[in-house]
């Protein structure tokens, strides 16, 4: 039964995160960037839940912090949350990292489904900043796989509830829809069996 619940959680997580990505992309094309800013705070909590980090929004520490959006000083982690997933954006983010973050680990968090193209490139992080594009680009596909691989269903439940509480989704719950349809079909079959022709 836990395997079925795991799948239900993962399906809901994927639906909600991909819905967020679509909204961020479309709103970005329309130059409506409010969701980009709100997403930074969402990702602070999401990444802290998944990885056990202590990220804070860097923009609350310094208005429009260059190159980074999220900081965890105790674990020496930096992250850039963006609706843009290009090599140029990663290069620019790395270039803008202040020297005071020498030796920190940098994560690029594009709010897109799949940023696999960006993993193919070579990057030159400054100030001995650690950045491996194969493991440090946290797109939705990467994050969903990370959650899916968690051994503890209670952790997945916590993350799924956090996402559900933060991302409203107009996609109907197919599990409830299917069980509702099954009920209607069984009732119709029962009613039809009572009709004598």
Predicted feature residues:
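Generic hydrophobic, helix-prone segments enriched in Leu/Val/Ile
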Residues: 14-21, 90, 180-184
């Amino acid at each position: 039964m836990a395997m079925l619940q795991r799948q239900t959680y993962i399906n809901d997580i994927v639906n909600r995160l991909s819905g967020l990505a679509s909204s961020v992309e479309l709103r970005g094309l329309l130059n409506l960037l409010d969701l980009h800013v709100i997403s930074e705070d969402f990702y602070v909590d999401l990444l802290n839940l998944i990885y056990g980090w202590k990220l804070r929004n860097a923009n609350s520490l310094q208005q429009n912090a260059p190159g980074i959006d999220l900081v965890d000083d105790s674990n020496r982690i930096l992250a850039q949350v963006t609706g843009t997933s290009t090599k140029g954006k990663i290069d620019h983010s790395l270039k803008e990292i202040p020297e005071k973050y020498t030796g920190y680990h940098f994560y690029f968090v594009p709010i897109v489904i799949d940023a696999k193209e960006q993993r193919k490139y070579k990057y030159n992080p400054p100030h001995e900043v650690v950045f491996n594009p194969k493991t440090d680009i946290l797109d939705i596909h990467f994050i969903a796989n990370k959650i899916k691989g968690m051994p503890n269903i209670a952790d997945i439940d916590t993350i799924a509830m956090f996402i559900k509480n933060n991302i409203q989704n107009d996609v109907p719950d197919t599990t409830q829809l299917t069980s509702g349809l099954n009920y209607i079909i069984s009732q119709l079959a029962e009613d039809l069996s009572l009709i004598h022709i």
